[in-house]
Amino acid sequence: MALDPSEQHLRHVEKDVLIPKIMREKARERCSEQVQDFTKCCKDSGVLMVVKCRKENSALKDCLTSYYKDPAFYEECKMEYLKEREEFRRTGIPTKKRLQKLPTSM
């Protein structure tokens, strides 16, 4: 059965696993300042990070949650996923392999 590259239907695993994975990655990029603050706090606090880094942890969770709950952000990530899936169905080459540089000389 040949799959239509431009077909828009999403399977359960795509909706519940793959698109949320893209959302997590993009949200972490967009909340990079909070991620850095929390990481620095954890490194500086050692064992006491649970107590000392509550403020940084709350700021990070608030930032990430704001993206997770944004329907426009979900749609953006969904379209990105569909574009990658369409390209894979056309070429048979996963995105990661397509983006790797080929050696220029042997």
Curated annotation (Swiss-Prot):
GO molecular function ontology, one term from the record: metal ion binding
A Pfam short name: Cmc1
Protein role: Component of the MITRAC (mitochondrial translation regulation assembly intermediate of cytochrome c oxidase complex) complex, that regulates cytochrome c oxidase assembly.
Chief site of localization: mitochondrion
Cystine residue pairs: 31-63, 41-53
Gene that specifies this protein: CMC1
InterPro entries documented for this protein: Cyt_c_biogenesis_Cmc1-like
Short sequence motif named Cx9C motif 2, residue ranges: 53-63
N-acetylalanine PTM sites in chain numbering: 2
Subcellular location, record wording: Mitochondrion
Record keywords: Acetylation, Copper, Disulfide bond, Metal-binding, Mitochondrion
Oligomer status and interactors: Component of the MITRAC (mitochondrial translation regulation assembly intermediate of cytochrome c oxidase complex) complex, the core components of this complex being COA3/MITRAC12 and COX14.
Name of protein: COX assembly mitochondrial protein homolog
GO cellular component, one term: mitochondrion
CHCH domain ranges (all copies): 28-71
Lineage: Eukaryota, Metazoa, Chordata, Craniata, Vertebrata
Positions occupied by motif Cx9C motif 1: 31-41
